[in-house]
């Protein structure tokens, strides 16, 4: 079983009945089956918010809406789809009566937290593969998720069909009784700790002010889904820097570290680009009677050595949390003597230092387990 988090979609039942569609549903001739999806969304064992030791933040498992799209086996024909709002993250819900026009071998994709009109613009599987989700639509309580592509080996029956219902065992389509997994398309970056190591250096007794934190080279777009379970969704290009998050009086010294996770940011998958996603920290070594303030912007690629450190990937992969710990030492700044008569000109722009001392922990997001609900 995978240790890292997925959201477990409890079951998929295909019913061979004909009934009236709701106004918002597509009106299709019902010669084949109808698709019903039963979901139970439950949280982690505890919902206490403690960003230092809980990987999943409150709301990150919410399933606000659920969408199902069904193509024929080759993906050349759209057989049916439906989008439906759900009542909340920790409530059972059913998306019922997704119409399909034919009882044939099918290609099925399940998504959560997607725009209502997404599927209405799609007519083939290849076309749907090109659709992109934007980072701006992602938030702590509305993270897009998707299943792998489910291609049935047998045709959908005109009788009832089930997929992912544990209690039904071999009665499921192709005998697939394990719950269907929904995986987030975003990743999360947490700056969990900032410290100094100035003892025995020229900066002993000094403190550092954290002025701002941002993300450089973050991917802002992703594909909605992958054919494989937890597969790649990285989109080309779409790389930019985030807006900085500014701080006031955020101070750190050898006696007082910052360990309350002052910075959290979502990004999209970025494993193949030459522009690797980086953390950027603007920090100032506080001056004293002898030395001036010295401000620099420190950067480091996130998870550049993931494989070397025992993780299963380098850089940024969807549905992971990257917990960053940084520190400043005797090599981080310069001692700049106080100038008796400083000139009237503006302060120089901070230099960029690519040698930020950083440790990266790659952790699972969740887990959140959904149990079957069969009505």
Swiss-Prot record:
Keywords: Cell outer membrane, Fimbrium, Lipoprotein, Membrane, Palmitate, Signal. Residues 17-47 form a propeptide. Its main location: other. GO terms for cellular component: cell outer membrane; pilus. It holds the Pfam family Fim1C-like_C. A lipid is attached at residue 17 (S-diacylglycerol cysteine). Residues 1-16 form the signal peptide. A lipid is attached at residue 17 (N-palmitoyl cysteine). It is found in: Fimbrium; Cell outer membrane. May be part of the fimbrial tip. Probably a component of the fimbrium tip. Fimbriae are filamentous appendages on the cell surface that mediate cell adhesion and biofilm formation. Belongs to the bacteroidetes fimbrillin superfamily. FimA/Mfa1 family. This is Putative fimbrium tip subunit Fim1C. It comes from Parabacteroides distasonis (strain ATCC 8503 / DSM 20701 / CIP 104284 / JCM 5825 / NCTC 11152).
């Amino acid at each position: 079983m995978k240790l890292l988090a997925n959201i477990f979609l409890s079951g998929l039942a295909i019913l061979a009945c004909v009934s009236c569609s709701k106004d918002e549903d597509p009106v299709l001739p019902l010669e084949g089956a109808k698709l019903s999806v039963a979901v139970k969304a439950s949280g982690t064992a505890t919902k206490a918010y403690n960003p230092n030791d809980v990987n999943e933040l409150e709301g990150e498992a919410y399933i606000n809406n659920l969408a199902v799209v069904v193509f024929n086996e080759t993906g050349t024909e759209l057989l049916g789809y439906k989008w439906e709002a759900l009542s909340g993250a920790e409530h059972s819900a059913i998306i019922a009566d997704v119409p399909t026009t034919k009882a044939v071998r099918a290609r099925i994709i399940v998504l959560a937290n997607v725009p209502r009109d997404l599927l209405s613009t799609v007519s083939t599987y290849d076309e749907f593969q090109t659709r992109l989700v934007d980072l701006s639509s992602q938030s702590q309580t509305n993270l897009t998720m998707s299943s792998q592509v489910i291609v049935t080996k047998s045709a959908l029956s005109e009788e009832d069909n089930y997929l992912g219902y544990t209690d039904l065992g071999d009665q499921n389509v192709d005998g697939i009784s394990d719950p269907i997994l929904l995986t987030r398309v975003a990743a999360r970056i947490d700056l969990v700790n900032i410290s100094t190591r100035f003892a025995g250096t020229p900066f002993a007794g000094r403190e550092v002010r954290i002025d701002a934190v941002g993300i450089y080279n973050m991917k802002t777009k992703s594909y909605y889904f992958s054919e494989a379970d937890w597969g790649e969704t990285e989109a080309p290009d779409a790389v930019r820097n985030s807006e900085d998050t500014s701080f006031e009086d955020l101070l750190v010294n050898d006696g007082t570290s910052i360990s309350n996770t002052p910075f959290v940011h979502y990004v999209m998958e970025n494993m193949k680009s030459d522009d690797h996603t980086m953390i950027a920290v603007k920090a100032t070594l506080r001056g004293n009677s002898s030395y001036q303030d010295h401000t620099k912007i420190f950067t480091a690629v996130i998870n550049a050595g993931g494989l070397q450190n025992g993780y299963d990937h380098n850089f940024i992969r969807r549905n992971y949390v990257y917990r960053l710990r940084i520190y400043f030492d005797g090599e981080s700044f310069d001692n700049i003597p106080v100038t008796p008569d400083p000139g009237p000109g503006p302060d120089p722009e901070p230099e960029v230092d690519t040698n930020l001392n950083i440790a990266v922990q790659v952790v699972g997001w969740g887990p959140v387990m959904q149990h079957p609900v069969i009505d």
